Amino acid sequence: MPGFLPEFTGKKNLQLLGMLQEGVTEEDIEEAMNAVGLDPKDRRHYKKYSLGMKERLGIAQAILKKPKLILLDEPTNGIDSDGIQMLEELLRRLKEAGSTIVVTSHDRDFLDAVTSQCYEMKEGSLR
């Protein structure tokens, strides 16, 4: 999970990250938060977020600038079944929009739902 400032809201954290990247607008931030099921108007500090909300904010950060390559490590960690379905749909849309998505996960059902190619790490070898 990326390092976010615990005393800031999710949106404020993304705004700070957006200042480090050229061309990130308020609309981009709100769109990314909405895409992962977070309310940009939520005034809770990051430290009050559940594990699933923290994971969603990390995914929002990853998609903020609509990158061509998205790397996600265990993105379903702490996310409930409704959130996983939302994430599956989001990843399908990003793939259709031209992004390449690399996911590491122990959740085989999730991988089957979102990947076109799947490799398994076993005894230090990729298969």
Task: Report the location of each language-model feature.
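H-loop/switch region of ABC-family ATPase nucleotide-binding domains
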Residues: S105-H106
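Hydrophobic anchor residue at the start of the ABC signature
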Residues: I59
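Catalytic Walker B motif of ABC-type/P-loop ATPase nucleotide-binding domains
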Residues: I70-D73
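Helix N-cap at the start of a conserved alpha-helix in ABC-type nucleotide-binding domains
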Residues: S81-D82
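Conserved ABC ATPase "signature" region
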Residues: Q15, V24-K41
